[in-house]
């Protein structure tokens, strides 16, 4: 556990794991059997982690969703899909590497995969624009969606972005049109679409690849119209109220499932997806398999009717007499 990055609220877990690592080093360097103490502390660490993650606050979930070791789109592609062949460029201007996509196989069935991609180090983060997609990324995604529709290939999207790139260059290249067109086109694509929020689901930047037939969120991911920090800056004129904003935004998977805004929650390993990315991928794959089975038998007309009904269900309200 030496290379694990612990969040602020995981301090007690980090201290326990540090003791375990120290005992293991001592055991290796001496003939003393410390296995009993190591096992005791390991069980205590696992229990503490489980208890802590069972009662995370919305703000703590935001921190987990942003964890630097959390699996990204290409990690899930490597674990879940085979024969992935990445496709580049929007055929109009450029190739935005904050969105990746291409052809792959899911259980030997051809499909199209599209998702946001962040970086692990400074160089990668700059190359991926820190996970903020530009208009070219959304146009590249739409090109792949249209390719999938042409050959009736199922589409899997993976959402993990703080939001669309807010730079002047993005506005000059018509960011709002790119997002709006994706929303419109995805609503009428005649092929199954399964969307999964794997980390941050930030506003229109997430929605632009988030319209589908089945919406999934990982247990400790978030989905919101605005980041807690930005919300705090607007409402309280101070970014230091991010925790209160997170509580008010209703951005967690369980809250959004209760509101009917997503369909399924994919549970994460104890301690979050970053603790065991491969196990997380196996758990998610089962949810994706079940989700695809539920929609792949529908013909194009049935698929569109069902999708339209889902979209029209969003935002319903009821008037009550005062």
UniProtKB/Swiss-Prot annotation:
Pathway: Lipid metabolism; malonyl-CoA biosynthesis; malonyl-CoA from acetyl-CoA: step 1/1. The keyword Cytoplasm applies. One of its GO terms (cellular component) is acetyl-CoA carboxylase complex. SUPFAM superfamilies: ClpP/crotonase. Thailandamide is a polyketide that is toxic to human cell lines but also has antibacterial activity on E.coli, S.typhimurium and S.aureus. It probably acts on acetyl-CoA carboxylase in the fatty acid synthesis pathway, which is rarely found to be an antibiotic target. These data suggest it might be a good starting point for engineering of novel antibiotics. Acetyl-CoA carboxylase is a heterohexamer composed of biotin carboxyl carrier protein (AccB), biotin carboxylase (AccC) and two subunits each of ACCase subunit alpha (AccA) and ACCase subunit beta (AccD). This is Acetyl-coenzyme A carboxylase carboxyl transferase subunit alpha 2. It comes from Burkholderia thailandensis (strain ATCC 700388 / DSM 13276 / CCUG 48851 / CIP 106301 / E264).
